[in-house]
Amino acid sequence: MALRFSKTPRLLTLFFSLFFLIPLVSPVNFVVIQPGEGTPLFPKVLQVKSSDIKTYKPNGQVYLLSIWVSTADAKILGAEAVACWVREDCVLFPRSVMYKRNTTTVKEEKKALQEMKASQSDAMSATKNYLKKNFPSVDISKLSDSSLKVSLPNTGGPSGGLIFSIGLIDFFTSEDILQGQKVAGSGTITADGKVGAIGGISEKIIAAKKAGATVLFASRENCGEIPENVSGISVVAISTLEEAMTYLQMVPRSNSRGVSGCTNLGA
């Protein structure tokens, strides 16, 4: 007896294959965010250009933290979005949350570089105000934006303000502020030393740990986004530059890990 098989199963197979395949190879309206790097600022990134300004060799290291964000022009495929979704160190955000409509990568990079430059200027102002109050013997008359050299290609945004300030204060004072520690930080800074929130704090905690930092300063405004189960690093939430410096100078080094300074931890 001859058997004749229906073509329907094959058509259904093809239909369902295309049904699942097409979304995977089609662009989706999302942005991918992943941990970036912890970049050490000493001795090459953060430098003082003027030989007339007295500086001291740091005993320790400070790290600028970054995150990796897909660009405004990037086409994220469905398969890439799924791969990100199943990873713990990858986050998806709607494109409209991260970027304005009709913006471009060039525009966003220019904006980020301007924010970085402004954060360096604010850090210098905050440093001078802190030194004037706490180290009056330090001559701050020659300190200015033009005396500072920062070499950070392909990095932008305002979140380096806090760690720039900590690095500069350690540069200009003879006191052993870092005491051999590896300190990371992420937060905006104002001229009067107030520390503001930044984006991607969870990813930056991962970057700090990979860099080998033992302490990470974060804005108290970010507490709601800091994970409860942080391990392997001390995350210290602060509101001002003064609080960060007090912690470094007054709190004994220990092997404690986790989060301090927050009452409302997030996910």
Could you describe each region identified by the protein language model?
Residues 2-267:
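Peripheral, non-AAA+ core regions of ATP-driven protein-machinery
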